[in-house]
């Protein structure tokens, strides 16, 4: 027995290359509206009056923006077993359907009997007679509006009150490390730049380019030099964003344009959406705002999640309007998100393409005419003339090898889960598309995040090197960054913007730590400076030497460890990481902690050691809990160690690889 596969009449997908829409900005404040029944401007025919054999017409667009109609006959009323609970089986006829049958992109095409609205086409059948389709009854489509409507506001969100940690007031502001700690320096190659990284002291700063990175292994089985990110302790992490954006079925049809092919597939998989071939507007076209569009049932419409130089838009059909400016469309969910704030646009159809599996429309979205606020099992709904706030993204890529610089910008729906899951592959897809290649090389990424809760913005710089695929490393980091900002548990951030500057080259820009030599044999005393030479070798270039000094901590005695390593290598073993006990309690503190996460372009130097056994016993006997527990943040502990001189961090314009440790003898009570 042959199985008939049922498919949702997916909207045809059209992605365009267009400029950013300036008036649409990030915001997401929720204004609650009381429930108001949706009353279509067309009279309706209830399902109880629909009988097999009744004939009517469906209205849709098959070319340009002209609404045409084709005949359809009711075959039967089917039990769907879920929402929608009933479906009307129809058989279409006439010249239009003879060419292609019922096609993807006809979702929402209204079905009338005797001038009364019965419902809209929502589903069809794969690999079978494309003249057969399923209509969602209008009574069930009206249930889209039986839900609270949430319309985003352009107002700034209220700031969540936070009590600053008591220890923060005592932190020394604007600390500058003395230049006398750099004893001498050999001359590196002209293209190597090494700069000091200062402590993050101050009133828990929100910005700093020495932030966030994570535990990194020097090599892996496939030879990549990899970077991963251990984003704080699990209980301190941002709220999980593992909300599925669709059910097991493939709701909606999306094909991503303006990004590399594999990042388009990444976004497709994230959306769990079907894709169909697309048309498109001219590259760089700006979708204008149309405050008074001519809207009619049966017209082609587009719904956009991203638009601008990166665009992801679904094209379907408008089903019905109400006098208060609301609409219903599609007759099935787009992504079944519930409340949403996607952009509603006009659409122009180029053609309907016949297919063996299914037919589909080719077209392109046009003017922005409103907002989609409901994405429900029975269809989508929204308002004409209301405009959705959005997040803004700018990506600038400089190809060091060619000397060329490229730029893309786009906006996307300000939905915390969409931002968390779609922004990262969209950004990395822009990088790959502008670079024009996928493979090994070096990427320096500087990302600045802006929003009402980020005073002056928050910035993070990192470098990545791979023998095989440098972009995948960048993707993982951006996923974590976007997750943190979009779904952090402390504060809504809007307007929300991301500016990304990228430098890429095929050359492995790696600086290897080859050797460390301590000046003098010791023993050294607590508080004394220890000088040492670090031999560094750029990839396939002559080595050079830099001389630094660290101060022996006052409490250390016996044998201590002088450790020099690349940022992110063995970061989890750093003493300031292990000693921190206090949890993160605000967005400000979260960002302050991320400011001290190491990056791959840093050289980290530290002296590690233990108190003498006698002092440890004495402290334990005192019974003073404060003496036994360190109620401080990691950032505060690292700043203290940098102030005392036992920890030192410098940043280079290279990826730093290697880890070397030396043992040094310390005078003092070693009992």
Model-assigned labels for residue ranges:
Residues 2-11:
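Bacterial N-terminal signal peptides that target proteins for export
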Residues 25-671:
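Terminal presequence/propeptide segments associated with secretion/organelle targeting
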Residues 11-20:
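Bacterial N-terminal signal peptides
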């Amino acid at each position: 027995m042959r199985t008939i596969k049922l498919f949702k009449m997916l909207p045809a997908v059209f992605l365009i290359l267009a400029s950013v829409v300036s008036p649409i900005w990030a915001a997401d404040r929720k204004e609650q509206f009381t429930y108001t029944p949706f009353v279509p401007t067309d009279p309706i025919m209830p399902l109880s009056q629909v009988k097999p054999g009744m004939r009517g017409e469906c209205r849709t667009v098959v070319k340009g923006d002209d609404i045409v109609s084709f005949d359809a006959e009711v075959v039967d009323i089917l039990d769907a077993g879920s929402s929608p609970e009933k479906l009307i089986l129809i058989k279409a006829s006439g010249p239009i359907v003879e060419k292609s049958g019922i096609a993807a992109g006809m979702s929402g095409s209204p079905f009338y009997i005797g001038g009364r609205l019965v419902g809209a086409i929502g589903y069809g059948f794969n690999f079978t007679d494309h003249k057969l389709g399923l209509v969602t009854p209008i009574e069930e489509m009206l249930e889209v509006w039986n839900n609270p409507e949430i319309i985003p506001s352009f107002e700034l969100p209220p700031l969540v009150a936070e009590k600053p940690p008591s220890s923060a007031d005592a932190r020394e502001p604007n600390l500058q490390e003395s230049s006398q700690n750099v004893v001498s320096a050999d001359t590196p190659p002209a293209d190597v730049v090494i700069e000091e990284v200062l402590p993050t002291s101050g009133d828990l700063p929100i910005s700093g380019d020495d932030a966030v990175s994570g535990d990194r292994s020097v090599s892996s089985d496939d030879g990549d030099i990899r970077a991963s990110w251990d984003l704080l302790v699990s209980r301190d992490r941002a709220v999980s964003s593992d909300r599925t954006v669709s059910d097991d079925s493939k709701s909606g049809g999306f094909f991503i344009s303006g990004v590399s092919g594999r990042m388009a597939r990444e976004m497709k998989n994230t959306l769990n959406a079907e894709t169909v071939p697309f048309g498109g507007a001219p590259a760089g076209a700006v979708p204008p705002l149309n405050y008074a569009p001519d809207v009619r049932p049966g017209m082609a419409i587009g719904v956009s999640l991203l638009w601008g130089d990166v665009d992801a838009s679904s094209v379907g059909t408008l089903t019905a309007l109400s006098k208060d400016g609301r609409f219903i469309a599609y007759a099935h969910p787009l992504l079944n998100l519930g409340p949403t704030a996607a952009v509603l646009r006009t659409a122009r159809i180029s053609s309907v393409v016949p297919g063996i599996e299914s037919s589909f429309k080719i077209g392109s979205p046009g003017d922005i005419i409103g907002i989609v606020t409901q994405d429900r099992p029975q269809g989508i709904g929204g308002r004409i003339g209301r405009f959705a706030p959005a997040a803004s993204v700018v990506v600038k890529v400089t190809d060091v090898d060619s000397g060329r610089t490229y730029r893309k910008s786009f906006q996307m729906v300000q939905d915390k889960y969409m931002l968390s899951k779609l922004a990262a592959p969209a950004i990395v897809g822009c990088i790959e598309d502008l670079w024009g290649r996928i493979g090994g090389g070096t990427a320096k990424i500087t990302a600045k995040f802006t929003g009402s809760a980020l005073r002056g913005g928050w910035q993070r710089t990192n470098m990545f090197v791979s023998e095989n695929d440098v972009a995948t490393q960048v993707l993982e980091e951006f996923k974590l960054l976007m997750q943190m900002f979009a779904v952090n548990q402390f504060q809504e951030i809007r307007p929300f913007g991301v500016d990304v500057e990228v430098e890429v080259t095929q050359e492995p820009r790696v600086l290897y730590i080859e050797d460390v030599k301590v000046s003098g044999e010791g023993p050294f005393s607590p508080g004394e400076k220890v000088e040492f030479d670090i031999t560094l070798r750029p990839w396939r270039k002559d080595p050079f030497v830099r001389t630094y000094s660290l101060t022996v901590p006052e409490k250390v005695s016996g044998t201590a460890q002088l450790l020099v390593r690349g940022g992110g290598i063995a970061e989890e073993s750093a003493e300031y990481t292990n000693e921190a006990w206090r949890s993160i309690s605000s967005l400000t503190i979260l960002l302050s902690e991320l400011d001290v996460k190491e990056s791959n372009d840093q050289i980290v130097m530290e002296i590690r050691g233990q108190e003498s056994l006698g002092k440890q016993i004495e402290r334990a006997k005192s019974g003073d809990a404060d003496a036994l527990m360190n109620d401080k943040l990691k950032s505060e502990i690292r700043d203290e160690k940098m102030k005392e001189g036992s920890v030192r961090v410098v940043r280079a314009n290279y990826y730093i690889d290697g880890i070397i440790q030396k043992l040094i003898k310390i005078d003092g009570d070693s009992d």
